[in-house]
């Protein structure tokens, strides 16, 4: 099997934005997940909307949606895309002291939305941290990963 080549580097190793102009417009989607782990008392405050900064879950959800739309401004070689859907779900696990974040992004375009889904999850997690850091600076953010993608030349992907 031939080694895969990095598409964002030219033959001299210089960074470049990939030319997708000859690719067909297809329906594409990507889903990513991540987690914020915190003290049970912090999660209780979030669940009861008891933080001074406001409703942490809804602010974080909106931040994730906004981040997906701004991915090309944050990651230098990402294409700006006309995203057709961003959905951010947050699930609290009181026993584990976690908020699980899942983002799904869709587009009809010439390139995928994996980075947009990952960015949405990352910024959602960061926003949860920001909203609750006054009561719990020991929170951790982790396990951010792509879990699924559909469409495009490389085909579908589902994490194991």
Swiss-Prot record:
Keywords: Lyase, Molybdenum cofactor biosynthesis. It catalyses: (8S)-3',8-cyclo-7,8-dihydroguanosine 5'-triphosphate = cyclic pyranopterin phosphate + diphosphate. CDD domains: MoaC_PE. SUPFAM superfamilies: Molybdenum cofactor biosynthesis protein C, MoaC. The active site is at residue 130. Substrate binds at residues 77-79, 115-116. It comes from the Bacteria. GO terms for biological process: Mo-molybdopterin cofactor biosynthetic process. GO terms for molecular function: cyclic pyranopterin monophosphate synthase activity. Pathway: Cofactor biosynthesis; molybdopterin biosynthesis. Its EC number is 4.6.1.17. Catalyzes the conversion of (8S)-3',8-cyclo-7,8-dihydroguanosine 5'-triphosphate to cyclic pyranopterin monophosphate (cPMP). Homohexamer; trimer of dimers. This is Cyclic pyranopterin monophosphate synthase. It comes from Parvibaculum lavamentivorans (strain DS-1 / DSM 13023 / NCIMB 13966). The gene is moaC.
């Amino acid at each position: 099997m031939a080694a895969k080549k990095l598409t964002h580097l030219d033959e001299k190793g210089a960074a470049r934005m990939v030319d997708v102009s000859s690719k067909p417009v297809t329906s594409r989607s990507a889903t990513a997940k991540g987690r914020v782990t915190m003290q049970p008392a912090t999660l209780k405050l979030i669940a009861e909307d008891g933080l001074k900064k406001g409703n942490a879950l809804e602010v974080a959800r909106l931040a994730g949606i906004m981040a997906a739309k701004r991915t090309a401004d944050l990651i230098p070689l990402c294409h700006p895309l006309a995203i057709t859907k961003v959905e951010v779900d947050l699930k609290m696990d009181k026993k584990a002291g976690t908020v699980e974040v899942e983002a799904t992004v869709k587009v009809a375009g010439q390139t995928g939305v994996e980075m947009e889904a990952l960015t949405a999850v990352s910024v959602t997690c960061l926003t949860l941290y920001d909203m609750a850091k006054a009561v719990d600076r020991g929170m951790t953010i982790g396990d951010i990963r792509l879990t699924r993608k559909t469409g495009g030349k490389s085909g579908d992907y589902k994490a194991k």
